Amino acid sequence: FLDAVAEFLAAEADSFPPVETLFMLEPSLVTDAPDDGEDERASEAIDTVADAIDADVVVHTYWGSIPEKPYAHLMDADVDAIGFDFVADHQGSVYNIQEYGTKDEIALGVVDGQNTLVETPEEIAERVEWVHEQVPAEGFETVYVSSNTELFYLPTNKAEAKLEALAAGATEVSL
Protein backbone atom coordinates (compact mmCIF):
# COMPACT_ATOMS: atom_id res chain seq x y z
CA PHE A 1 0.00 0.00 0.00
CA LEU A 2 2.82 2.40 0.87
CA ASP A 3 4.43 1.76 -2.51
CA ALA A 4 1.11 2.42 -4.28
CA VAL A 5 0.65 5.73 -2.44
CA ALA A 6 4.22 6.74 -3.28
CA GLU A 7 3.71 5.92 -6.96
CA PHE A 8 0.43 7.85 -7.02
CA LEU A 9 2.03 10.91 -5.41
CA ALA A 10 5.04 10.65 -7.73
CA ALA A 11 2.70 10.71 -10.74
CA GLU A 12 0.94 13.76 -9.28
CA ALA A 13 4.27 15.55 -8.71
CA ASP A 14 5.41 14.65 -12.21
CA SER A 15 2.28 16.27 -13.66
CA PHE A 16 2.88 19.61 -11.90
CA PRO A 17 3.78 22.62 -13.97
CA PRO A 18 7.37 23.74 -13.34
CA VAL A 19 7.85 24.71 -9.68
CA GLU A 20 10.92 25.76 -7.75
CA THR A 21 10.09 23.98 -4.49
CA LEU A 22 7.75 21.15 -3.51
CA PHE A 23 6.61 21.01 0.13
CA MET A 24 5.57 17.50 1.13
CA LEU A 25 3.49 17.80 4.31
CA GLU A 26 4.08 14.68 6.36
CA PRO A 27 2.50 14.71 9.85
CA SER A 28 2.30 10.91 10.06
CA LEU A 29 6.04 10.65 10.74
CA VAL A 30 5.18 12.36 14.05
CA THR A 31 1.64 11.25 14.87
CA ASP A 32 1.89 7.64 13.66
CA ALA A 33 5.61 7.04 13.31
CA PRO A 34 6.47 3.94 11.29
CA ASP A 35 7.61 0.84 13.16
CA ASP A 36 11.04 -0.73 12.79
CA GLY A 37 11.55 -1.77 9.20
CA GLU A 38 8.68 0.40 8.00
CA ASP A 39 10.64 3.58 8.77
CA GLU A 40 13.16 2.74 6.05
CA ARG A 41 10.33 2.00 3.60
CA ALA A 42 8.76 5.38 4.43
CA SER A 43 12.05 7.06 3.53
CA GLU A 44 12.13 5.13 0.24
CA ALA A 45 8.54 6.21 -0.49
CA ILE A 46 9.56 9.84 0.04
CA ASP A 47 12.46 9.26 -2.36
CA THR A 48 10.02 7.98 -4.99
CA VAL A 49 8.04 11.22 -4.84
CA ALA A 50 11.12 13.46 -4.63
CA ASP A 51 12.70 11.78 -7.65
CA ALA A 52 9.60 12.46 -9.76
CA ILE A 53 10.02 16.24 -9.85
CA ASP A 54 12.78 18.59 -10.92
CA ALA A 55 12.54 20.92 -7.93
CA ASP A 56 13.85 21.33 -4.42
CA VAL A 57 11.88 19.04 -2.11
CA VAL A 58 11.05 19.86 1.50
CA VAL A 59 9.51 17.21 3.76
CA HIS A 60 7.68 19.22 6.40
CA THR A 61 6.51 17.39 9.51
CA TYR A 62 4.19 18.83 12.13
CA TRP A 63 2.18 18.28 15.30
CA GLY A 64 5.38 17.62 17.23
CA SER A 65 8.90 16.43 16.60
CA ILE A 66 9.92 13.30 14.73
CA PRO A 67 11.02 10.30 16.83
CA GLU A 68 14.72 9.50 16.52
CA LYS A 69 14.69 6.42 14.28
CA PRO A 70 12.25 7.76 11.65
CA TYR A 71 14.24 11.01 11.74
CA ALA A 72 17.44 9.11 10.97
CA HIS A 73 15.78 7.49 7.95
CA LEU A 74 14.35 10.84 6.84
CA MET A 75 17.90 12.22 6.93
CA ASP A 76 18.82 9.45 4.46
CA ALA A 77 16.02 10.48 2.09
CA ASP A 78 16.93 12.26 -1.13
CA VAL A 79 15.29 15.57 -0.18
CA ASP A 80 16.74 19.06 0.00
CA ALA A 81 15.25 20.14 3.32
CA ILE A 82 13.40 18.94 6.37
CA GLY A 83 10.69 21.10 7.89
CA PHE A 84 10.27 21.31 11.65
CA ASP A 85 7.29 22.30 13.79
CA PHE A 86 8.57 24.97 16.16
CA VAL A 87 5.04 25.75 17.40
CA ALA A 88 3.94 22.36 18.77
CA ASP A 89 7.38 21.13 19.95
CA HIS A 90 10.22 23.58 19.60
CA GLN A 91 12.45 21.77 22.11
CA GLY A 92 12.10 18.38 20.41
CA SER A 93 12.76 19.91 17.01
CA VAL A 94 15.88 21.67 18.28
CA TYR A 95 17.02 18.42 19.93
CA ASN A 96 16.83 16.54 16.62
CA ILE A 97 18.86 19.22 14.85
CA GLN A 98 21.45 19.47 17.64
CA GLU A 99 21.78 15.73 18.11
CA TYR A 100 21.53 14.44 14.53
CA GLY A 101 22.02 17.47 12.30
CA THR A 102 19.80 18.22 9.35
CA LYS A 103 19.98 18.95 5.64
CA ASP A 104 21.77 22.00 4.17
CA GLU A 105 18.35 23.63 3.78
CA ILE A 106 15.67 23.86 6.48
CA ALA A 107 12.03 24.85 6.85
CA LEU A 108 11.07 26.52 10.11
CA GLY A 109 7.40 26.15 11.00
CA VAL A 110 7.14 29.22 13.23
CA VAL A 111 3.56 30.37 12.55
CA ASP A 112 0.60 28.46 14.01
CA GLY A 113 -1.37 27.05 11.10
CA GLN A 114 -4.18 25.86 13.39
CA ASN A 115 -5.01 29.19 15.07
CA THR A 116 -6.64 32.30 13.63
CA LEU A 117 -4.48 34.61 15.76
CA VAL A 118 -2.10 36.29 13.31
CA GLU A 119 1.49 36.56 14.50
CA THR A 120 3.28 39.87 14.02
CA PRO A 121 6.31 40.09 11.74
CA GLU A 122 8.37 40.86 14.86
CA GLU A 123 7.21 37.65 16.58
CA ILE A 124 8.08 35.65 13.49
CA ALA A 125 11.54 37.22 13.24
CA GLU A 126 12.14 36.52 16.96
CA ARG A 127 11.22 32.85 16.50
CA VAL A 128 13.56 32.45 13.53
CA GLU A 129 16.36 34.17 15.46
CA TRP A 130 15.67 31.91 18.47
CA VAL A 131 16.14 28.81 16.31
CA HIS A 132 19.38 30.25 14.96
CA GLU A 133 20.61 30.84 18.54
CA GLN A 134 19.84 27.21 19.45
CA VAL A 135 21.73 25.73 16.49
CA PRO A 136 24.47 28.27 15.72
CA ALA A 137 26.82 25.60 14.38
CA GLU A 138 24.40 24.82 11.56
CA GLY A 139 24.93 26.97 8.49
CA PHE A 140 21.94 26.65 6.19
CA GLU A 141 22.06 27.38 2.47
CA THR A 142 18.33 28.13 2.46
CA VAL A 143 15.91 28.80 5.30
CA TYR A 144 12.20 28.52 4.49
CA VAL A 145 10.11 30.46 7.01
CA SER A 146 6.68 28.87 7.08
CA SER A 147 3.65 27.87 9.09
CA ASN A 148 3.93 24.76 11.20
CA THR A 149 0.98 23.13 9.38
CA GLU A 150 -1.01 23.89 6.27
CA LEU A 151 -3.21 26.99 6.41
CA PHE A 152 -5.99 25.35 4.38
CA TYR A 153 -8.49 25.10 7.25
CA LEU A 154 -8.20 28.74 8.31
CA PRO A 155 -10.59 31.38 6.99
CA THR A 156 -9.13 32.83 3.79
CA ASN A 157 -8.57 36.28 5.30
CA LYS A 158 -6.62 34.78 8.23
CA ALA A 159 -4.54 32.51 5.99
CA GLU A 160 -3.66 35.45 3.74
CA ALA A 161 -2.80 37.62 6.77
CA LYS A 162 -0.49 34.90 8.08
CA LEU A 163 1.25 34.65 4.69
CA GLU A 164 1.73 38.42 4.63
CA ALA A 165 3.12 38.31 8.18
CA LEU A 166 5.49 35.49 7.18
CA ALA A 167 6.80 37.50 4.25
CA ALA A 168 7.27 40.61 6.38
CA GLY A 169 8.79 38.66 9.28
CA ALA A 170 11.36 36.99 7.06
CA THR A 171 12.65 40.40 5.98
CA GLU A 172 13.05 41.49 9.62
CA VAL A 173 15.30 38.60 10.65
CA SER A 174 18.77 39.69 11.69
CA LEU A 175 21.28 36.86 11.92
Predicted regions and their residues:
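Active-site loop segments of alpha/beta catalytic cores
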Residues: 1-92, 101
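Terminal disorder- and signal-encoded targeting elements
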Residues: 18, 48, 52, 137, ...
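Catalytic-face loop-and-helix region of soluble metabolic enzyme cores
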Residues: 77-172
